[in-house]
Amino acid sequence: MNTEKPSVAHNVDHNEIAKFEAVASRWWDLEGEFKPLHRINPLRLGYITERSGGLFGKKVLDVGCGGGILAESMAREGATVTGLDMGFEPLQVAKLHALESGIEVEYVQETVEEHAAKHAQQYDVVTCMEMLEHVPDPQSVVHACAQLVKPGGEVFFSTLNRNGKSWLMAVVGAEYILRMVPKGTHDVKKFIKPAELLSWVDETVLKEQHITGLHYNPITNTFKLGPGVDVNYMLHTRAKKA
């Protein structure tokens, strides 16, 4: 059995990239495939902003930025934002939308490992939202994010827990019953238990600050943050000061 990890320059699942490339043109359609991302973005932004003590004047990196939903919203808060993604089409959509919106965001097509090799300790805040479950080596991504943040800076991760409930909610429910996201968006085998993510964090300069769940109520069709990390969750970490 081949146990070699992908090289840092190729920590990419091309099937995952292809899935998002295929629907990239509809990234900013509020009623399209990315409607859930638009719906949860105010919650993500609020969490990041509050726990970072505000984003104004800060240098921010959004890892796995896709079409730029979170990146643009952080730029609107006054941050200097760089968006990183390996999908060409999503980045083209992001660049065009930023231009049309009058928002300045720098978008770069490269892996986070490649970016870390050139920009170590250059960011006040690093975000990595709904990206870890789409790469072959999420541990490598966590390590790279830790390298990119300044001492004392903030790093945020969000992903999906791996258990029966998350499979029912995120795959069966969201993809096949409610059709909130396209079928095949998620692979439960790639979901990440909080203990696994925290073990990778502990290998770096990062320290856990707070963890919260992201919950969907199908009856009220609303999202909220709160206790319980059995499906979607967000983790706030902080780099040790020099």
Curated annotation (Swiss-Prot):
Q: Which Pfam families match?
A: Methyltransf_23
- GO terms, biological process: methylation
Coiled coil located at which positions? none
Keyword terms = Methyltransferase, S-adenosyl-L-methionine, Transferase, Ubiquinone biosynthesis
Q: Which HAMAP family match?
A: UbiG
| Family statement drawn from the similarity comment of this UniProt entry | Belongs to the methyltransferase superfamily. UbiG/COQ3 family.
One GO molecular function term? methyltransferase activity
Pathway listed for it is: Cofactor biosynthesis; ubiquinone biosynthesis
Residues reported to bind S-adenosyl-L-methionine: 44, 64, 85, 129
Gene name linked to the record: ubiG
Supply the EC number(s).
2.1.1.222, 2.1.1.64
General function of this protein: O-methyltransferase that catalyzes the 2 O-methylation steps in the ubiquinone biosynthetic pathway.
Put simply, this protein is called Ubiquinone biosynthesis O-methyltransferase
- Give the organism the record lists: Salmonella typhimurium (strain LT2 / SGSC1412 / ATCC 700720)
